[in-house]
């Protein structure tokens, strides 16, 4: 596959929580120019804001009123950016399929990182749009084993590329001082890094917060009422923290947690934070998420309910050093650099 540029359509903001899209695309941008197209953003006037963020060009459609995702103006701006180059269309959401109109005949990659139709407030037409995208994509990359299993019936176009880790970045947690936000908190400190939304088990958090520990949730609260979250004095919500500061946060954790609910929104998740936690040499406790059990069940403590989760957190100090070391080595084996290289080789064979 010969391409001169990549056009990306994403439901996530490029300057949001640093995760799979940013990790992959900043690396792909070292090979060819990348345009990252976001969903519309309400503003006082209609225009397409185009700016460089690192080595990626970000197009944010600003609209004075509600507009369709990837509307005609966005498609026109994308077409102008492409110019006469050979483009690859790379989508994270089926709702952006119209971006393909900016480059008729261009190959399409669907990097499927979540079962978006199962999320709260998903557009009712999303499933139909995904059917169209699955039919048109030359390659379907799945960010986890469960997503792969649900789509492998489509044949050789479907590839498993579970999320990786920037190992050296997170391994710094072993050698640096804890973040100032954590230095005065009583131990043990159990921490979560990521979006706080409908995937979090609020009742489980309440059970955990009743124990003698500090609970720290690092990330934006979205799609849920913050008032429904535990409001105890030992529970702390920091909001989003810069990616550069995450190792210092992990340096202050006694245990890292994944307190996910068991619901439709979590049935197919493969949390990027798993190898990030492990690379930091922190004991990890998770609820019974299928992909975590399948890929990391031997190095992550898996809890079946709220009480066993809280018990595992409080017992984390007794985690055998061999288990922590094995988790570190597991994380070392799944670098983003290696994943991007394998993706590129796969596309060259298409």
Locate the predicted segments by residue.
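N-terminal subdomain of nucleotide-sugar transferases
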Residues: 1-43
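Nucleotide-sugar-dependent
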Residues: 15-19, 200, 244-249, 256-279, ...
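Membrane-proximal helix-turn-helix segments that form the acceptor-binding/catalytic region
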Residues: 123-140
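Carbohydrate-associated surface elements
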Residues: 146, 161-173
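Conserved donor-binding/catalytic core segment of Leloir-type glycosyltransferases
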Residues: 182-199, 205-209, 215-218
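Nucleotide-activated donor-binding/catalytic signature segment of Leloir-type glycosyltransferases, i.e.
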Residues: 219, 224-248, 348
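Conserved acidic donor-binding segment of nucleotide-sugar-dependent glycosyltransferases
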Residues: 298-307, 314-320
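A charged, aromatic-enriched C-terminal amphipathic alpha-helix characteristic of glycosyltransferases
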Residues: 318-348
């Amino acid at each position: 596959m010969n391409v001169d540029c990549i056009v990306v359509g994403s439901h996530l903001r490029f300057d949001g929580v640093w995760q799979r899209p940013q990790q992959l695309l900043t690396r792909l941008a070292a090979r060819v120019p990348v345009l990252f197209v976001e969903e519309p953003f309400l503003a006082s006037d209609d225009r397409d804001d185009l700016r460089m963020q690192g080595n990626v060009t970000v197009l944010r459609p600003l609209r004075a009123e509600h507009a369709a995702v990837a509307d005609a103006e966005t498609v026109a701006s994308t077409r102008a950016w492409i110019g006469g180059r050979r483009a690859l269309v790379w989508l994270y959401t089926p709702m952006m399929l119209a971006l393909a109109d900016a480059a008729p005949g261009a190959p399409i990659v669907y990097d499927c990182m979540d079962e978006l139709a199962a999320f709260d407030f998903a557009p009712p037409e999303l499933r139909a749009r995904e059917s169209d995208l699955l039919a048109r994509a030359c390659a379907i990359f799945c960010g986890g084993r469960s997503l792969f299993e649900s789509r492998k019936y489509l044949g050789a176009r479907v590839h498993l590329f579970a999320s990786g880790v920037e190992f050296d970045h997170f391994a710094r947690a072993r050698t640096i001082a804890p973040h100032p936000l954590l230095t005065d908190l009583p131990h043990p400190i159990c921490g979560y890094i990521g979006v706080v939304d409908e995937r979090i088990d609020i009742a489980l958090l309440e059970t955990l917060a009743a124990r003698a520990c500090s609970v720290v949730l690092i990330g934006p609260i979205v799609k849920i009422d913050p008032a429904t979250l535990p409001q105890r004095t030992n529970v702390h919500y920091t909001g989003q923290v810069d990616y550069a500061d995450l190792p210092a946060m992990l340096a202050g954790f006694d245990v890292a947690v994944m307190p996910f609910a068991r619901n439709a929104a979590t049935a197919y998740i493969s949390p990027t934070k798993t190898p990030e936690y492990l690379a930091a040499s922190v004991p990890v406790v998770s609820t019974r998420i299928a992909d975590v059990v399948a890929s990391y069940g031997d190095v992550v403590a898996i809890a079946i309910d709220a009480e066993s989760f809280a018990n595992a957190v409080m017992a984390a100090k007794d985690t055998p050093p061999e288990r922590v070391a094995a988790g570190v080595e597991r994380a070392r084996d799944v670098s983003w650099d290696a994943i991007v290289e394998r993706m590129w080789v796969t596309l060259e064979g298409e």
